Amino acid sequence: MVDDSAVVRQVLVNVLNDAADIEVIATAADPLLAIEKMRKQWPDVIVLDVEMPRMDGITFLRKIMSERPTPVVICSTLTEKGARVTMDALAAGAVAVVTKPRLGLKQFLTESADELVATVRSAARANVKRLAARVTAAPLEAEVKHTADVILPAQSGRAMAQTTERIVAIGTSTGGTQALEEVLTALPRVCPGIVIVQHMPEKFTAAFAARLNGLCQIAVKEAANNDRVMPGRALIAPGGKHLLLRRSGAQYFVEVLEGPPVNRHRPSVDVLFRSAARAAGSNALGIIMTGMGDDGAAGLLEMRQAGARTVAQDEQTSIVFGMPKEAIKRGGADRILALGAMAREIVTQLQ
């Protein structure tokens, strides 16, 4: 646990040590102290702040990834600057991001403690050597579990208007920021409209979209309510909001809305995929990529049953082979592809 705030360190340590399968073996106020302690006992996961004295978190992260690749979870503030620096950290090899405890400690323990524990567990399973190679080349009250049905409106039963416009729906989680960068930067300007759910806290997705927009030939933006899904543009679900695909005549739009977490996530891949099955049917391509858990597995199956082409990322190129594995297990994927083949599959949708 590396953070220059003693208060933050103590809060995070208490949360993680309360989990039966997690032990915090050391804390440090800066990366230089962390290096000394890690030489004595190397951790399975590092939780890292990005703005610290003596050595910043990004420099430390790059050092770790080049010398001894280890899963790193970034713990960042909900500020514009914090979001930008966090994107740099994810690009440098961090596997996930969580938000720092703010003044409302009780609110953090209620809303974010479980997310922190789940993120650290997920990071421990990450194939970080593959990620490094790519970079260099318990709740306070009973949990209520929801399915995408609580977000999706009731089906009207009316036949969909005919359209030939193709869309692509992508869902991903741990390791997904790097995977999305690899896929989207490989796309030409002429490609189908894309809608994306990447599990990420609110405030960070706008910076993520802006970074991709500067790297890609296609346009990339954080989705806003009623944005049209257009060829040559990717819309990324805002953190903390669900993203649905809608049809109006022969055009597709997105709806951004509140609602309870689905499969413990908001945004949820299942919500996007199931809405795509209903709105686009056989005109859609569904892609599920690296991530822990089963979010998106049910939705990908529904897309396939609606006539869509569906793809799961293979185990060899996944940082965490959880979500794709579950989708394959349930029969939702009609193809299993390496990450490097995803862009070609998207372009094929135009044909």
UniProtKB/Swiss-Prot annotation:
Root EC class: hydrolase
Modification type 4-aspartylphosphate: residues: 49
Post-translational modification: Phosphorylated by CheA. Phosphorylation of the N-terminal regulatory domain activates the methylesterase activity.
Catalytic activity: [protein]-L-glutamate 5-O-methyl ester + H2O = L-glutamyl-[protein] + methanol + H(+); L-glutaminyl-[protein] + H2O = L-glutamyl-[protein] + NH4(+)
InterPro entries per record: CheB-like, CheB_C, CheY-like_superfamily, Sig_transdc_resp-reg_Me-estase, Sig_transdc_resp-reg_receiver
A single Gene Ontology CC term: cytoplasm
GO MF annotations, alphabetized: phosphorelay response regulator activity; protein-glutamate methylesterase activity; protein-glutamine glutaminase activity
Domain CheB-type methylesterase: 161-351
Subcellular location: Cytoplasm
Spans traversing the lipid bilayer: none
Residue numbers annotated as active site: 173, 199, 295
Catalytic activity, EC: 3.1.1.61, 3.5.1.44
Keyword Nucleotidyltransferase: no
Alphabetical list of PROSITE patterns matching this protein: CHEB, RESPONSE_REGULATORY
SUPFAM superfamilies membership: CheY-like, Methylesterase CheB, C-terminal domain
Entry keyword set: Chemotaxis, Cytoplasm, Hydrolase, Phosphoprotein
GO biological process: chemotaxis
Residues annotated as domain Response regulatory: 1-115
Family annotation (HAMAP family): CheB_chemtxs
Family: Belongs to the CheB family.
Record note on domains: Contains a C-terminal catalytic domain, and an N-terminal region which modulates catalytic activity.
Role played: Involved in chemotaxis. Part of a chemotaxis signal transduction system that modulates chemotaxis in response to various stimuli. Catalyzes the demethylation of specific methylglutamate residues introduced into the chemoreceptors (methyl-accepting chemotaxis proteins or MCP) by CheR. Also mediates the irreversible deamidation of specific glutamine residues to glutamic acid.
Protein name: Protein-glutamate methylesterase/protein-glutamine glutaminase 1
Gene name as annotated: cheB1
